[in-house]
UniProtKB/Swiss-Prot annotation:
One of its GO terms (cellular component) is intermediate filament. Signal peptide: none annotated. This is Keratin, type I cytoskeletal 50 kDa. Keywords: Coiled coil, Intermediate filament, Keratin. Belongs to the intermediate filament family. InterPro entries: IF_rod_dom, Keratin_I. Optic nerve. Residues 262-284 are annotated as: Linker 12. Residues 170-261 are annotated as: Coil 1B.
Length: 467
């Protein structure tokens, strides 16, 4: 914040005896007086300068008042006062007066008293306006201090902050987080149960697969055995057919031999000799035939019994293996159906898991965004508090500066009043005397106004200009 102050110096020249006095730093005042003597006196060009400035030291204006008085005679005297003052609060006033008298004779301007009254009235009006402005600024400053104090108490005091709305939002968010945590816990538990069930079914599937492979290996072995038995049966059937053909061939040869022997016996001559009786060939052949037929029948029965036994055994084994194969096929079908159902359930659980993971990620992202927004809001509020504290410090400095200005202005006003009281007394007691036979003595006083402009930044004078 930059403030400007103007200082005015008025010096008096001419006459007999002169004095100058410099006032406080925010304004200036000068006093000059002169007494002239002679046959006649003339007092003219008496000026009183005034300086006042607007708020903050800007818009500085210098006002001057001129009073001219003349008197003729053997002697004369005069006095002049000038005051000027200005402050950053915005106010200023000026006053100038002059009086003279002589013995030699002359005339006085009749308007002096009226002009002095008008000047005093103007001075009083300006002083009243300035005081009103000071009171209004004090009141506004008090209101601002009260507002700042209330704002800081409401915003910066930990006990005075109202977090009820935030508490409700935080409670809702905590409830939502707890619900999501419970849901996630249930989902994790369901996933673990599904994993355990999947592992159990996988173990069962591996066991059933091993059993199936074992049953398929047994079935393959039984099929090979069945093929071997089928080949053995075919071989036996071929042997039976060969034996039947051989039996038929033997029967045919036997019949041919019998026929040949009968034909030979019919053409022979019976010669009886005294010898031992021969055996009956027919009976022998019949016995041989019976013996061979018995052996053949026995072999056939044994073959039939063996074939029947083997057939029954193979049939039983094939039936048992067929039933086992059918049961195994049924079990394999059931296991396949169960495996397909488990795979479908596993896919659904995996899809559910992915969906829940996506929901969890979305929830975390949404809560992260909300948390970021809340943190940004907290940061913004903290920055506002810092700015408010800076504004409070700045306004406190401005208030202190205005208070100092007010104090100095009050001191200047008191000094002005004291000088005005002293000036009024000197006016009432001043006079001039002299003698002469008609000569004229004139005295002229010139008041020079000097204005000093200073640029003040943070209480330090940056530049100074004298006009």
């Amino acid at each position: 914040m930059t403030s400007f102050s103007r200082q005015s110096f008025m010096s008096s020249g001419g006459g007999i005896g002169g004095s100058s006095m410099r006032g406080p730093s925010m304004g200036s005042m000068s006093r000059s007086s002169g007494i002239g003597g002679g046959g006649g006196g003339h007092i003219s060009a008496m000026r009183a300068g005034s300086v006042y400035g607007g708020a903050g030291g800007h818009g500085v204006r210098i006002s001057t008042g001129t009073r001219t008085f003349a008197s003729g005679g053997g002697g004369g005297g005069g006095a002049s006062y000038g005051f000027g003052g200005g402050s950053g609060g915005g106010g200023g006033f000026g006053y100038g007066s002059g009086a003279g008298g002589g013995f030699g004779g002359g005339d006085m301007d009749a308007k002096v008293n009226v002009s002095e009254k008008a000047t005093m009235q103007n001075l009083n009006d300006r002083l009243a306006t300035y005081l009103e402005k000071v009171h209004s600024l004090e009141k506004a400053n008090g209101d601002l201090e009260l507002k700042i104090r209330q704002f800081l108490e409401n915003k910066t005091s930990p006990d005075a902050r109202d977090y009820s709305a935030y508490h409700a939002t935080i409670s809702d968010l905590q409830d939502m987080i707890q619900d999501a945590t419970r849901i996630n816990g249930g989902v994790y538990l369901a996933i673990d149960n599904a994993k355990l069930a999947t592992d159990d079914f996988k173990t069962k599937y591996e066991n059933e697969l091993a059993m199936r492979q074992s049953v398929e290996a047994d079935i393959a072995g039984l099929k090979r055995l069945l093929d071997e038995l089928t080949l053995a049966r075919s071989d036996l059937e071929m042997q039976i057919e060969g034996l039947k053909e051989e039996l038929i061939y033997l029967k045919k040869n036997h019949e041919e031999e019998l026929a040949s022997m009968r034909s030979q016996m019919t053409g022979t001559v019976n010669v009886e000799v005294d010898a031992a009786p021969q055996e009956d060939l027919s009976r022998v052949m019949a016995e041989i035939r019976e013996q061979y037929e018995g052996v053949s029948a026995k072999n056939q029965r044994e073959l039939d019994a063996w074939f029947q036994t083997k057939s029954e055994t193979l049939t039983k084994e094939v039936t048992a293996n067929t039933e086992t194969l059918q049961v195994s096929k049924t079990e394999v079908t059931e296991l396949r159906r169960t495996l397909q159902g488990l795979e479908i359930e596993l896919q659904s659980e995996l899809s559910k898991k992915r969906s829940l993971e996506g929901t969890l990620a979305d929830t975390e992202s949404r809560y992260s965004i909300q948390l970021t927004q809340l943190q940004a809001r907290v940061t913004s509020l903290e920055e506002q508090i810092v700015h408010l504290r800076g504004d409070m410090d700045r306004q406190s400095q401005e208030y202190q500066m205005l208070l100092d200005i007010k104090t100095r202005l009050e001191m200047e006003i008191a000094e002005y009043r004291r000088l005005l009281d002293g000036g009024a007394t000197s006016f009432s007691t001043s006079g001039g005397g002299g003698g002469g036979g008609g000569g004229v003595v004139s005295s002229t006083k010139t008041i020079t106004v000097k204005t000093i402009e200073e640029d003040i930044v943070d209480g330090k004078v940056v530049s100074s200009t004298t006009k």
